[in-house]
């Protein structure tokens, strides 16, 4: 039986074909010439010390629907940065998450920290789109990609000077992710097949990831106690969105998570 991830990937392949017709690759490459310089996403989220926050600009999700009605991506991103986020993640999927590349462009202009394009990346064309929109990093999801595509997309991202955040859920995918040389590895605590979350998943996986690779824990992080557990396990960064954007006072939510006075 097809999962929500299967459905999203099938939809995305159609969207990519349509995008290539609407905006040929030559036009995307031309737009890259005027894109802002790349900021060092890897350095921002892997600095020694506290667990670094990658705060996500997220309007909706397939499981929860609309998360925030008064959604202003640039203002949310500025709030995140002002309260201590080390980087910003922007969802660009339109159908399932109500995101857009325009949101990414707006966020990139609004903040001084590095910005990640969070998307179901299946084609090098999307990597070019990301850079043209000002992205400093791009997410790759191992569960969506075979070995060849994973390696090709990783190299495409690196060739443009951006950071690849390579995400996995299934531990069986870890050898594949390590084989391409990924330095920044995301552990999704949400099973993309069932959409259930389990923070323990990151803690278990930290023991399997080599110490010279930086680890990002993604999904299901809600409290300062959760952050303390990640820190104790040696996790470098966390990607948090839903538990922040649903709060009336986003800045206060970030302060609580980071333990700001």
Go through the PLM ranges and name each one.
Residues 129-149, 186-195, 235-254:
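Glycine-rich phosphate-binding active-site loops on the catalytic face of alpha/beta enzymes
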Residues 204-208, 231, 246-261:
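C-terminal helical cap(s) of enzyme catalytic domains, especially alpha/beta-barrels
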Residues 184-240:
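Catalytic-face loop-and-helix region of soluble metabolic enzyme cores
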Residues 122-133, 169-180, 217, 221-240, ...:
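Catalytic cores of alpha/beta
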Residues 11, 58-60, 93, 120-121, ...:
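Active-site beta-loop-alpha junctions enriched in small/polar residues
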Residues 6, 86, 136, 183, ...:
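Receiver (REC) domain switch/active-site residues of two-component response regulators
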Residues 52, 57, 64-165, 171-176, ...:
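N-terminal active-site wall of soluble small-molecule enzyme domains
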Residues 2-70:
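An N-cap/entry alpha-helix motif that binds or orients negatively charged groups
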